């Protein structure tokens, strides 16, 4: 029984507060041109809106009295959704790309890894540089740390070290993130 009540409460909260759903004793009304009309009872404000063929939409319930606007709700909803889509387009979800190598890497192979990392960083992704060891190679972890420091120095113009080179089991890992452009 209680669960059913909670769900119905949630549904009513999700619905937009327009026209008859506005349950405040007094509301501040703004017309479709942005001019303040004054403080009205919701019923009077709804009548004012219906005369113009528009809706009364609650814009801000935080202020005292709550602010309502007279506008076309369909158009308002469309513009809100359009803004949300635009904001989502501009948003870039950065992911972590990994560049793996061994501590005994040749110069050309190293340059290829640097180019890969720079492409990832320029596209806004973070780069996890990993150097793996096999067998007794783990004794040379200082060489791997030096190699990762060299990599960070080579990418200093486009990247900043987020996590310094550190041992993680049979690997040495460093995390680079793209530099923020101001």
UniProtKB/Swiss-Prot annotation:
KW Cell cycle (keyword) present: no
GO biological process entries: ribosome disassembly
GO molecular function annotation: ribosome binding; translation initiation factor activity
Keywords: Chloroplast, Initiation factor, Plastid, Protein biosynthesis
Any one of the GO CC terms: chloroplast
Database matches in InterPro entries: T_IF-3_C_sf, T_IF-3_N_sf, Translation_initiation_fac3_CS, Translation_initiation_fac_3, Translation_initiation_fac_3_C, Translation_initiation_fac_3_N
Record-linked Gene3D superfamilies: Translation initiation factor 3 (IF-3), C-terminal domain (3.30.110.10), Translation initiation factor 3 (IF-3), N-terminal domain (3.10.20.80)
Family in the record: Belongs to the IF-3 family.
Purpose of the protein: IF-3 binds to the 30S ribosomal subunit and shifts the equilibrium between 70S ribosomes and their 50S and 30S subunits in favor of the free subunits, thus enhancing the availability of 30S subunits on which protein synthesis initiation begins.
Binding partners and assembly: Monomer.
Protein name per Swiss-Prot or TrEMBL: Translation initiation factor IF-3, chloroplastic
Organism: Porphyra purpurea (Red seaweed)
Encoding gene, per UniProt annotation: infC
């Amino acid at each position: 029984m209680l669960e059913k009540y909670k769900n119905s409460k949630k549904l009513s909260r999700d619905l937009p507060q327009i026209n008859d759903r506005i349950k405040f004793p007094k509301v501040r009304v703004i017309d479709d041109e942005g001019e303040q009309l004054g403080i009205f009872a919701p019923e009077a404000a709804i009548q004012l809106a219906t005369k113009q063929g528009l809706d009364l939409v609650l814009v801000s319930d935080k202020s005292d009295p709550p602010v309502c606007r007279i506008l076309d709700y369909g158009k308002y909803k469309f513009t809100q959704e359009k803004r949300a889509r635009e904001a989502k387009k501009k948003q870039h979800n950065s992911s972590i790309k990994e560049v793996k190598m061994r501590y005994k890497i040749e110069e050309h192979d190293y340059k290829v890894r640097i180019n890969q990392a720079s492409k990832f960083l320029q596209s806004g992704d973070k780069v996890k540089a990993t150097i793996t060891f096999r067998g007794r190679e783990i004794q040379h972890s200082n060489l791997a740390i030096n190699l990762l420091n060299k990599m960070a120095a080579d990418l200093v113009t486009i990247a900043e070290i987020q996590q310094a080179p550190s041992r993680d089991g049979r690997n040495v890992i460093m995390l680079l993130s793209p530099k923020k452009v101001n």
